[in-house]
A protein has these predicted regions:
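Short, conserved, GDST-rich strand-edge loop motifs in beta-rich repeat architectures
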Residues: 130-140, 245-273, 436-452
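C-terminal segment of N-terminal export signals and the immediately downstream linker at the start
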Residues: 11-13, 32-86
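Short loop/turn motifs that recur once per blade in beta-propeller domains
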Residues: 80-94, 98-100, 105, 157-169, ...
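Gly/Ser/Thr/Pro-enriched helix-cap/hinge segments flanking short amphipathic alpha-helices
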Residues: 67, 79-80, 88, 98, ...
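N-terminal export leaders
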Residues: 14-26, 156, 206, 290, ...
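Beta-propeller blade termini
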Residues: 110-120, 149, 171-181, 199, ...
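N-terminal secretory signal peptides
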Residues: 1-41
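Hydrophobic beta-strand segments that make up the repeating blades of beta-propeller
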Residues: 126-130, 186-191, 239-243, 322-326, ...
Length: 636
């Protein structure tokens, strides 16, 4: 305990010093900055030799300290998640790497998913990224990405082959946004190899326009997480693409040749010892094409590497989007928008680079949301097995405080997290947390290692006092059933007013976790349509004020019962959630106020809206649609 406190103090002191240094005119060499940036008790930022055993930060599980009394502690959850994928028609096995053994790390990362209303009928469809295997497939039998159309009865129809999305390869992440502002949301999919930009034709089909859009890459890259964002606020969606490892299979050592091990088990080599990739930023030129501005925008001036997932949001309340990147085995990256077309990595100064005791973690997934309802966006990040997941609370001054242990997320360290999302599972107006787990190495099955390839999920209920309660074993069979999960998306696919999840798994059919609730609480959904801002409204911030009957225990007296959320192109691990923003309202009878801050700077205010309705709101404050959603006539 003494050393833990000492580490925290030193970590805070270093962060404070770096923050103050950034405000001075002192100029240091890159070498000096890196010396200051290295954790007091952490690992050195050096290249590990090829063939070294995988080094992952270890954290002891620890219960949270006693917090303020919570009105929900010990009360029934009131919701159950049930996997209805097969009954709903999601019967296609998703492929990724070897089933029992992998030669390369390439075979381990898995794919993302999207709840994606591609036909604009306000019923969520499902897109699943698919993968590949080293040995390949016979012609005509290649696994391809899948698109499932919502039948509005709880089931889906596979429309992949006529959609134009049947692309094969080592698929990774997906993100959604209307890059050409034609009113139809488009789809970007990252790959190990060439990425793919699919333009929505507005008739149920897509056209791949990667080359025409200027996104064709001149070399082999392992592209990872992606996000559309309007970083320069010109009304056109730009594109961020993370890069994991600069991987050449011809030169990457095999496990048995390089003695690559995990807890004594021979496994795929890396990422330590392998060259990290360089993240990419493409500026939308406004004519349907993009320009690579990665280097001049500051994407390559980072301490951390091995990028996996990302999240783009206004994390410092400046009105400009920043980018947070979960890096594997190195410090995280936090690109802060300089408002001049460039970014600076300020992860260390902001306190989001390392663990509480200043060590690099193996980050996987990222979700952003205001869990304590203080009007500032926080970050939750999944990490490797043996470590906690991370919860960073926004302090409002451009920095964050690691509240993992204080909030109750430090009790679990055994499972390996991938997908993650802030999600109001019970519509009480407070963001809960869902985590999808699954080990990276199939080789752990059948060994003496305390791990399994397929793992259950974590479900944390928000106690409204800054802490969470682990209710994983009470969340239903969809939570407790083991799965080889990777990315998942969140959305209300059956329009019944509660949030569901679709989970992409490796070498298995996906999961469709339907949320069955007995609570009958209020909610409101808001979909935005930009005019001066990008058409999708990505980057817009929505504030909802309603008397939810659930006091803000962590707020100052007199604080209104407000929630905030932003429209984002990606969420969790490699995935894209519903672009309709969902607010749980507990017992509220009406919405007192909706305030929308658009990327253009315009602010719209609407008052006295009804609950349990979908509102489609155009920039300028015009309500294009106001309807009560009719739940699916459930067959599944």
């Amino acid at each position: 305990m003494v050393r833990s406190t000492e580490n925290a103090v030193l970590s805070f002191t270093r962060r404070g010093f770096l923050k103050s240094l950034s405000r001075t005119a002192v100029v240091l060499s890159l070498e000096d900055v890196l010396k200051l940036a290295r954790p007091a008790f952490g690992q050195q930022a050096t290249q590990a030799p090829k063939g070294s055993a995988r080094q992952a930060y270890k954290a002891p599980p620890r219960a949270a300290p006693k917090g303020a009394p919570s009105p929900v502690t010990g009360t029934p959850l009131g919701v159950q998640f049930v996997d209805v994928a097969k009954e709903a028609g999601l019967n296609v096995e998703m492929i990724f790497g070897g089933e029992h053994r992998n030669k390369y790390l390439l075979e381990t990362t898995g794919c993302g998913a999207a709840f994606f209303d591609y036909d604009q009928d306000d019923w969520l469809d499902i897109f699943l990224v698919n993968g590949w295997r080293l040995e390949g497939f016979p012609k005509g039998h290649e696994p391809v990405c899948r698109l499932f159309k919502n039948n509005r009865d709880g089931t889906f129809t596979d429309v992949t082959m006529k959609s134009g999305l049947a692309r094969s390869g080592w698929g990774q992440a997906c993100c959604v946004g209307d890059y050409n502002n034609d009113g139809w949301n488009d789809l970007f999919v990252s790959y190990y190899g060439q990425n793919a930009l699919f333009r929505n034709n507005g008739n149920g089909t897509f056209t791949e326009v990667t080359k025409e859009a200027g996104l064709l890459q001149d070399r082999l890259r392992w592209n990872s997480g992606c996000s559309f964002l309007d970083y320069n606020k010109d009304g056109h969606l730009d594109l961020f693409v993370g890069n994991y490892i600069d991987l050449d299979l011809k030169t990457t050592p095999l496990p048995e040749d390089a003695n690559c091990t995990y807890k004594g088990i021979v496994v795929a080599c890396g990422p330590p010892g392998l060259e990290g990739g360089k993240n990419l930023l493409y500026r939308n030129k406004g004519d349907g094409t993009f320009e690579d501005v990665s280097e001049k925008a500051g994407m390559w001036g980072t301490l951390g590497t091995y990028a996996l997932s990302c999240g783009a949001a206004d994390l410092d309340n400046t009105g400009w989007p920043n980018i947070y990147v979960a890096n594997d085995s190195t410090s995280a990256t936090y690109y802060v928008n300089q408002k001049d077309g460039t970014f600076k990595d300020q992860a260390i100064e902001a306190g989001v680079a390392y663990s509480p005791d200043g060590k690099p973690q193996a980050g996987m997934g990222v979700s952003i949301g205001d869990y304590n309802r203080d009007g500032m966006l926080d970050i939750v990040k999944t990490n490797f097995a043996g470590d906690t997941d991370s919860l960073f609370m926004n302090l409002g001054d451009g920095s964050f405080d690691d509240r993992t242990y204080q909030a109750g997320l430090g009790i679990n360290t055994r499972l390996l997290g991938w997908g993650v999302s802030f999600i109001d599972i019970d519509n009480d107006g407070w963001l809960d947390i869902l985590v999808a787990n699954g080990h990276v190495y199939p080789e752990v099955d059948g060994t003496q290692v305390d791990a399994a390839y397929a793992e259950r999920k974590y479900l944390y209920r928000n106690l409204r006092n800054g802490q969470f309660e682990d209710l994983s074993l009470s969340g239903g069979s969809g939570i407790t059933t083991d799965a080889k999960a990777r990315g998942f998306a969140v959305g209300d696919y059956d329009n019944d007013g509660d949030l569901d999840a679709v989970v992409n798994c490796v070498n298995a059919v996906p999961q469709l976790l339907r949320c069955d609730s007995t609570l009958n609480r209020s909610w409101v959904k808001i979909r935005l349509v930009g005019t001066k801002s990008n058409k999708t409204g990505i980057g817009a911030r929505i504030k909802v004020v309603a008397d939810t009957g659930s006091p803000v225990l962590t707020a100052k007296p007199g604080t209104p019962f407000a929630q905030i959320e932003e429209v984002r192109s990606c969420n969790g691990y490699y995935s894209a959630s519903d672009l309709r923003i969902h607010f749980g309202l507990n017992d509220a009878k009406k919405v007192d106020l909706v305030e929308i801050r658009w990327p253009s700077g315009a602010v719209d205010t609407l008052k006295d809206l009804d609950v349990k309705r979908l509102y489609v709101i155009e920039e300028g404050g015009k309500i294009l649609k106001n309807e009560a959603l009719v739940p699916a006539r459930k067959k599944a």
